[in-house]
């Protein structure tokens, strides 16, 4: 019998086993030739549930019986390695391909093992641990399709305390929380995240997790969870516990003379701004630490400009200073050395007057009201007044009461001096000299006024904390003349001035006045030759003119006279050596 006759005798309807298949033959080809490629063969009596049905798979038996349980399959990882595993493969059933994953791409199912064609999932558990009973509880199939990567990963039992937890399952409000080892996971997660005993459901989700799922949290738990025995919550510490601990005793520092560091603070920092030592020129006198204790009758020095040289003054100068201190009232009892040193340490970086003027200032730069104050309008008169000072007072009317501070025309500048030595010599010789830039600015201002108004200069020593006087510029700058009287040889040029006020006015009296042309800074925070606007200058001049001062540089005039004589003798010795 030929093949064609067999085809003719074949009953109708058997040409294609697929219901929707073609019924027409084309070009002598039979549709049966394409059956292996078009669709799998339909098996009769297939009573298995669909793949999406994840509720009743445990009620059906496998289609093929095996002599061993797949749950007893040997582990291929060689130990309890805490690493994620892909979900299980489907069991071999009637020639079906065994490599098809049952829940790889978003199929719902509990514990990442949705059964394939009604078969039990491969659960990676050793014998005796069977989770088939879990298929009946409400937790099975609770993973919704909204989960971005549902049932993608599962974890080894060793890393989760014996329970295989779906990588995307949410721990809150599910019966999976009842699984063995969940306390360990919660405690480990709490120790990892918060360091407390809160449950993992209270931990905020990590930014970047997949569509509101707990996969990242589960991954962290699987790789970092620790047994409860190793979790040690931090011991709470209260302020009472901290206060009850004894303080560590600091070793007492001792000076070169063996005096305890608690009674003698360290001396002030010595900068390279000493008078007569500019650019390492002139003698550099170092004051021994004993000088602070021996000079009890002298107020302490806090200025880095005067500590080195004024501590080594000759005895006549020291005697003269004592006379200035005790002139207005009987001499007070000598102060202890420790009190004198404490006064110095209170202002280690502030300038303090070298003699009697130190008692006129408080620690905050405000004038004090203690004993030994001079009368308003003049400095304290020494027991033996210096003849140069007497001559200056007879010629000049310092601190006039009828000063006209309400200027209609005029310009006012701030002058910052490196030392009071130069202030003393400016008063003595009625001259002044600024930097090259400052001289040009002052000279231009003086020439611009052309006699229409005064040019006032407000003097202040760097770091002194007060203004020491006001002078009027009386001539243009002579750039070709060098006065040769300044404590430093760096100044070139000179111009004449007339001193009007010689008094110490603390910065606290003027700090509220701010300059709009200097970043709105206080007038006390100005640089050399900083111009003060006229309206603000009127306020400054009014305060200086009306301030009842208690100290001035006249109190130390004899001291600075002696210093000038010493400097001149040193210069003569240098000139003699140079010849």
From Swiss-Prot:
**Where is the sequence biased in composition, kind Gly residues?**
359-371
Sites binding RNA sit at 416-418, 422, 432-433, 462, 486, 491
Location, primary (coarse class): cytoplasm
Q: At which residues is Phosphoserine found? A: 2, 4-5, 22, 39, 196, 359, 394
> Annotated Gene Ontology MF terms?
C5-methylcytidine-containing RNA reader activity; mRNA binding; N6-methyladenosine-containing RNA reader activity
Q: Which domain of life is it from?
A: Eukaryota
Query: Where does the record place Polar residues bias?
Result: 291-316, 372-383
N-acetylserine modification, residue list: 2
Q: Where is this region: Disordered?
A: 1-45, 247-387
Q: How is it modified after translation?
A: Ubiquitinated by the SCF(SKP2) complex, leading to its degradation.
- What is stated as this protein's family in its record? Belongs to the YTHDF family. YTHDF2 subfamily.
Q: What is this protein called?
A: YTH domain-containing family protein 2
Organism from which the protein derives: Macaca fascicularis (Crab-eating macaque)
């Amino acid at each position: 019998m030929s093949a064609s006759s067999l085809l003719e005798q074949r009953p109708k309807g058997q040409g294609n086993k697929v219901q929707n298949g073609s019924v027409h033959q084309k070009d002598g080809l039979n549709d049966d030739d394409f059956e292996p490629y078009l669709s799998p063969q339909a098996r009769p009596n297939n009573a298995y549930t669909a793949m999406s049905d994840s509720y009743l798979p445990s009620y059906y038996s496998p289609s093929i019986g095996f002599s061993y349980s797949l749950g007893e399959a040997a582990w291929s990882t060689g130990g309890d390695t805490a690493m994620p595993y892909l979900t299980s493969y489907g069991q071999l059933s009637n020639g079906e391909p065994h490599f098809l994953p049952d829940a790889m791409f978003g199929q719902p199912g509990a514990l990442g093992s949705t059964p394939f064609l009604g078969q039990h999932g491969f659960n990676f558990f050793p014998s005796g641990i069977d989770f088939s009973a879990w298929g009946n509880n409400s937790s099975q199939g609770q993973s919704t399709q909204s989960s971005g990567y549902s049932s993608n990963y599962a974890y080894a039992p060793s890393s989760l305390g014996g329970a295989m937890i779906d990588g995307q399952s949410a721990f809150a409000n599910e019966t999976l929380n009842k699984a063995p080892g969940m306390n360990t996971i919660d405690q480990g997660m709490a120790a990892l995240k918060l360091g407390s005993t809160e449950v993992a459901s209270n931990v905020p989700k990590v930014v970047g997790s997949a569509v509101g799922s707990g996969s990242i949290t589960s991954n962290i738990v699987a790789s970092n969870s620790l047994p409860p025995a190793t979790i040690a919550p931090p011991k709470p510490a209260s302020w009472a516990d901290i206060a009850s601990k004894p303080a560590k005793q600091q070793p007492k520092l001792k000076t070169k003379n063996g005096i305890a560091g608690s009674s003698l603070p360290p001396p002030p920092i010595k900068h390279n701004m000493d008078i007569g030592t500019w650019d390492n020129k002139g003698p550099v006198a170092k004051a021994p630490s004993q000088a602070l204790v021996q000079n009890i009758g002298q107020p302490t020095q806090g200025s880095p400009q005067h500590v080195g040289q004024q501590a080594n003054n000759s005895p006549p100068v020291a005697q003269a200073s004592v006379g200035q201190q005790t002139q207005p009232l009987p001499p007070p009892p000598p102060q202890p050395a420790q009190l004198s040193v404490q006064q110095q340490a209170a202002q280690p970086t502030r300038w303090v007057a070298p003699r009697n003027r130190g008692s006129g200032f408080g620690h905050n730069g405000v004038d004090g009201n203690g004993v030994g104050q001079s009368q308003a309008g003049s400095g304290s008169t020494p027991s033996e007044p210096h003849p140069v000072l007497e001559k200056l007072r007879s010629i000049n009317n310092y601190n006039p009461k009828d000063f006209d501070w309400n200027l209609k025309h005029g310009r006012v500048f701030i002058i910052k001096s490196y030392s009071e030595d130069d202030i003393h010599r400016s008063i003595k010789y009625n001259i002044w000299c600024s930097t090259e830039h400052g001289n040009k600015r002052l000279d231009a201002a003086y020439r611009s006024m052309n006699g229409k108004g005064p040019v006032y200069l407000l003097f202040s020593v760097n770091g002194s904390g007060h203004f020491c006087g006001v002078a009027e510029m009386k001539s243009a700058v002579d750039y070709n003349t060098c006065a040769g009287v300044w404590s430093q040889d760096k100044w070139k040029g000179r111009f004449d001035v007339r001193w009007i006020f010689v008094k110490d006015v603390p910065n606290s009296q003027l700090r509220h006045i701010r300059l709009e042309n200097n970043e709105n800074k206080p007038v006390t925070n100005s640089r050399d030759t900083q111009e003060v606007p006229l309206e603000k200058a009127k306020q400054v001049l009014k305060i200086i003119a009306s301030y009842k001062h208690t100290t001035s540089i006249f109190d130390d005039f004899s001291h600075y006279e002696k210093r000038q004589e010493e400097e001149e003798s040193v210069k003569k010795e240098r000139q003699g050596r140079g010849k």
